Each structure stands twice: as C-alpha cells, then as structure tokens.
Amino acid sequence: MKFGKRLKHQIQQTLPEWRNKFLCYKDLKKLVRLISLAPMSLGVSVGKAEAEFVYLLNVEIEKFNSFFMEQEEDFIIRHSELQQRIQRVCSTLGPEGSQPSETDYKDEMERIRKDIINFHGEMVLLVNYSNINYTGLAKILKKYDKRTGGLLRLPFIQKVLQQPFFTTDLVSKLIKECESTIDRLFPTVKQKNKRADMVERSNTTTDGLNIFRNTVAALETMQEMRSGSSTYSHFSLPPLNIPEPDLIRSVQLNSPIPIP
C-alpha cells in the first residue's frame, strides 16, 4: 500500500479529535510537484521555493510537537491518577482493606480494568502518531530531493530526530508500566473461560470499542512501517523491539472483542 493511502486509512481509523493533527501529506506532495514543474523563468528561484517548502514543513512539525506534548502531559497525569485509584480501591475495598467488600471491590476493579485498556490503547495510538508522521516527512523530503535535485532530506531529518514528537521513550515506558499493571491485576483468562468472559465484557462503552479497534489498526500500521524491506534505509524506522504476539496480547487481554 502506498504511503498516501496508508496515511488516509490511518486518519480514518484514529480518534475523531486527532484527525486534523496528522501530516498534510497530500498538500505537500502537490507543492513538490508544482515546484518541480515551475519554470524558473517565472521568477521563482529555487532558493525561494525551497524556503517556502521548509517553512510549511516547520509549521507541520510545530503542529506535531504541540499535539504530542499535550497528549504526553495528559498521559502522565492519567497514569498517576490510575495508580492512586488502584491503591485506594485495594486499601479500602480489597480483602485486606479498611472496609472490605467483595462486590464493591469487583465492580470498581472492573471499571479500572476498562479504563486501563482504553488508556493503553490511546498511548499506543500516540506512538503510532509519531511513527507515521515521521515516515511521512521522510517520504515527502525524498520526493522533494528526487524531483528538484535538492539536498534537503538529510539535514532536515537530523533536525526532526531531535523534536519532541519523535521522542517516544516516556510514552513507551508508560505503555510498559500499563501492561505490567494489567498482568499483575488481571491475569490472562484461561482458554476454556475466554468465550464467556468476552460475552461478559461486551457491555463496554462505544468509546472503548473504538479505541480498541483503532489500537489494533495502529499496531498493524507500526508493524508494516517498521518491517524490513528492499527500500529500507537509515531514514527508516527501526523494527519494533516487542514481538507482535506480545503487542496484540497486551491489547486483547480483557478487551471487548477478540482479535482474529
């Protein structure tokens, strides 16, 4: 699948409020074509055209950084609140709590489980947001250099690698901690009970279902973009260092619908 179609599909699959935060790849692609076809006799110098192109790329990067940092800050707060909530429920309603109640404890932990799954999914979506926008920038810069004879790609990508939106270490750490919490509090259901458990969880919210489906789509996109190919270069994203089964399991665990 060509990148433009993949990006369009990913935007359609993501959360509605995120859709205008992605790279304007189609517009930039049109601009590259216009620059490459414009006769220099019209008075448009190569330097001026390149400056305009770089300006638009910088506007896109500012958009990515602003959105990414806003989401990252929100995730830090939500992660802390979830941990405090878990501790509070366990210390109050748990078997060794100050006011133990099996029914209330079970109900609260079920709500926490759904919130953790949704939270995990949103964080995976943000990592995918970083990946797909970086890939888009690398591809549009490659097109620019190829069609204009410019040498913009290497220095610009070196700049991109230092941008906040590309630095996903903190979010990846939160994802790992979230997965550890899931494994600790909600062990994987045995196979013979899995179907009944899926039916029981089918009452989850529409938002939860949407986040789950979008997360699966994001994981598939990340695997595709990071897999080795004949066009792999030092501009490409490295392969995922987490095996796909673990990624899928971490999302499927206690999810409302099974992944084929």
Model region roles, listed by residue range:
Residues 1-135, 141, 161, 190-194, ...:
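Phospho-regulated, Ser/Thr/Pro-rich intrinsically disordered or coiled-coil terminal scaffolds
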Residues 145, 151-182, 186-190:
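Mixed-charge, low-complexity intrinsically disordered segments
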